[in-house]
């Protein structure tokens, strides 16, 4: 490790991968599922099998059963709830007080719902309170929870006004993610094929102020994915750019974060069209935690497979460097990362892949964008075998065109 005067993309990328067990998976006893998720700064989990794979691939010898035990065991170390961007994530149970404080403090954008369908601030608080009361000590399906919420609030909460995948949802569901952010709702084990919800355990940890939680979240993000710019943090958090710029400026003034110079030829995407240049030290600057300026001297080498919505793919920038050349069009969905499982070669996206399951048999189709060397082909075969181990199946590698489109 060294502290360079100018940080290259390859050095920044190598540090990110190293810190979240992608360069070298955690050895047995080094880190469990909760520690791995903590290093990832949450694991997106709307596709359960993909989230299990994200975590399992970062741990040598782990399977999805290790992840499930961390979620649903007698003393769970992971919670499945609504996290960054209002999407479903795994979060470490021990860190839930921090996350609820940070997510509750975060500035949000405009409501996506029609004015007549929105909840007033008082209605929002009433529903969040009702959700917490209804889930205390029990596990409810969405229909059971809906009945409880409407009974505790009023018929207005059950009005079918929210567009859904098939039909309409009741008004109260517009704040389910907020209930998760407030720490009064999380997922529980399925009841058959039905999803259930419960209230997470109350922690004895001291409550963080909104300012403390926000500072810690920014520092955690920069430790995992820095150097980064305010708008990259804002994109990850689904928060307004202006709010993020203000937070970064405040932390910089307090000496909590510092600017480093990124190699100018590698920061085209990072150049800001906004008026943050003076705050960030120039178009080639990005931020790290104060004092965290050492980077690996060697670039990443090797082949990795990452599933849908992997945290590294979503949070790492600049996109044009992580998805170079044809990968930018093939492995992104309208510029959105995570919608395709990706093949990494030497730390950058070099293809896409898809797995189809039939019983214990897994057919893993990998589409490299360029021909792999013999050594890379052997590494790929090993990665496919590891995917099978994590998902408790027997995996077969097929190299060819992936015909499945982007995940919604």
Language model features with spans:
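Glycine-rich, small/acidic residue-mixed loop/short-helix segments
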Residues: 326, 331-408
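A short, conserved structural fragment
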Residues: 72-83, 87-88, 181-190, 253-262
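Non-catalytic regulatory appendages
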Residues: 255-263, 281-328
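Short, amphipathic alpha-helical interaction segments positioned at domain boundaries
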Residues: 101-114, 201-219, 302-304, 312
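Phosphate-backbone binding and catalysis cores of DNA-processing enzymes
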Residues: 1-162, 168, 408
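Short, cationic-aromatic polyanion-contact patches
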Residues: 90-96, 191-211, 281-297
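A short acidic, leucine-rich amphipathic alpha-helix
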Residues: 70, 144-150, 179, 230-234, ...
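Acidic, glycine-rich loop-and-beta core segments that form the ion-binding/anion-interacting portion
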Residues: 201-263, 281-283
């Amino acid at each position: 490790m060294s502290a360079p005067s100018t940080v290259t993309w390859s050095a920044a990328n190598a540090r990110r991968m190293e810190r979240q067990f992608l360069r070298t998976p955690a050895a047995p006893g080094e880190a469990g599922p909760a520690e791995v998720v903590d290093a990832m700064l949450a694991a997106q989990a709307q596709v359960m099998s993909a989230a299990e794979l994200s975590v399992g691939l970062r741990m040598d010898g782990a399977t999805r059963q290790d992840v499930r035990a961390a979620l649903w065991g007698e003393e769970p170390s992971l919670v499945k709830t609504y996290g960054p961007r209002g999407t479903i994530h795994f979060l470490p149970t021990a860190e839930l007080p921090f996350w609820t404080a940070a997510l509750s403090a975060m500035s949000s954008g405009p409501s996506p719902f029609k004015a007549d369908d929105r909840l007033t601030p008082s209605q929002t608080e009433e529903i969040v309170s009702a959700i917490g009361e209804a889930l205390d000590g029990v596990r409810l399906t969405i229909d059971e929870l809906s009945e409880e919420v409407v009974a505790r609030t009023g018929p207005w909460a059950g009005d079918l006004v929210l567009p859904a995948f098939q039909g309409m949802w009741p008004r109260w569901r517009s704040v389910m993610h907020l209930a998760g952010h407030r720490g009064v709702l999380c997922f529980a084990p399925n009841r058959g094929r039905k999803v259930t919800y419960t209230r997470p355990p109350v922690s004895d940890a001291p409550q963080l102020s909104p300012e403390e939680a926000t500072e810690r979240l920014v520092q955690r993000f920069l430790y995992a994915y820095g150097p980064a710019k305010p708008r990259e943090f804002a994109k990850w958090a689904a928060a307004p750019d202006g709010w993020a710029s203000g937070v970064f400026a405040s932390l910089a003034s307090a000496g909590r974060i510092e600017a480093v110079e990124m190699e100018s030829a590698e920061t085209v995407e990072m150049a800001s069209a906004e008026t943050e240049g003076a705050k960030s030290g120039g178009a080639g600057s990005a931020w790290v935690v104060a004092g965290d300026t050492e980077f690996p001297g060697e670039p990443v080498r090797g082949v990795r497979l990452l599933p849908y919505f992997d945290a590294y793919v979503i949070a790492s920038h600049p996109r044009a460097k992580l998805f170079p050349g044809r990968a930018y069009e093939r492995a992104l969905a309208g510029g959105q990362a995570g919608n395709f499982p990706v093949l990494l070669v030497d730390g950058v996206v070099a293809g896409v892949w898809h797995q189809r399951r039939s019983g214990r048999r897994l057919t893993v189709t990998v589409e490299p964008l360029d021909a792999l060397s013999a050594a890379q082909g052997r590494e790929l075969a090993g990665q496919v075998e590891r995917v099978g181990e994590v998902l408790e199946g027997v995996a077969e590698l097929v190299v060819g065109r992936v015909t499945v489109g982007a995940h919604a």
